[in-house]
Amino acid sequence: IEGIYLPDDNILFNSTRCGTSVDCWFTEVSNLFICDRSGKYMRQIGFDQVHTLHPVLLEDGRVVYTRWDYNDRGQIFPQPLFQMNFDGTGQAEYYGGNSWFPTTITQPCAIPGSRKVMAVLMGHHNPQHGKLAIIDPEAGRDENEGVMFVAPVRKPEAVRVDGYGQEGEQFQHPFALNQTDFLISYTPLGYNIGTPIEFAIYWMNIDGERELLVADSKISCNQPVLVAPRRRPFQRVNMVDYTKNTGIYYLQNIYEGRSMKGVTPGTVKKLRIVELEYRAAGVGCAYGHGKGGGGHAFSPVGVGNASWDLKKVLGEVDVEPDGSAFFEVPSRKPLYFQALDENGHVVQTMRSWSTLQPGEIQSCVGCHEHKNLSLIHI
């Protein structure tokens, strides 16, 4: 489902053929795949724990999508926007990866002539509609820093709510025509939670002026798309080398980044490399609780606050005195890292994961550094 054309004429789509199931339930997981236009050369490029949804192509050739991030986190607030290059390289946070708000960011669409996206903000345990916003990562990456409601334009409050954005008028599936006008599935009347509501297609602008285009008394109208020629997005060189089965990480300085605040340089001696192993089916449930909500881990490897997934330690690599590290890892695997001191104790752990494509070389400035941070001058 959710297929999109890529600049190199391949097709990116979402599929449950990865064969795993949701950590907190029994539903099949959907991940991102690529094939050519005839359906050949199909390969998986997202190796993600739960769903990756609603991929959209930006004008600069990047793909933005919703990714569920459950690794060592609660189950309610882990649905930020992620980004990747069209060949699957460069998978990284786009917005909200270390944030309580917005609860869920989904159904993104590119805004022509802009590096921003329009998206729907909603909760975790509610239907797939909510409030409409423009996301600007250049203004910030977390909470409400780079978020602006539209129709009308206003700044949202950063709140911590599960069923977010379900009061009043409801929005679904925006399609931006330019930086002020868009098509939208919309209902002005709202609904009572649990009661189906009917959507219609509107033209609308960011001030909230609107015109009804399509409506049906018996069924909702959703997912408008403009059928018109468009400029092919930027096509960068494909960096994937499928003759290889590894990739390389370069870390410039592990002490850079908000999560390492207060850690004395020289404390971290090694990085532990851990692979997440997902499950094909639920085998029971361990109930955990925390600030991120309850956690129903259906692949229990312990009791009480059990881990979502099995963790396989691949090894450890040295961290140099200047905080740098350079190491090779298996490609096409979900990996996360733990910073260790001289006693092998964990100083900080990564509550997400990273995946490299074959032959990919990926660099980072620090440990959970702000994504708007430039390289450190040496």
Regions found by a protein language model. Name each.
Residues 11-15, 63-67, 116-120, 182-185:
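Residue position within the beta-strands of beta-propeller blades
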Residues 135-147:
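Short loop/turn segments immediately following beta-strands, especially the blade-tip
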Residues 201, 361-372:
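The canonical Cys-X-X-Cys-His
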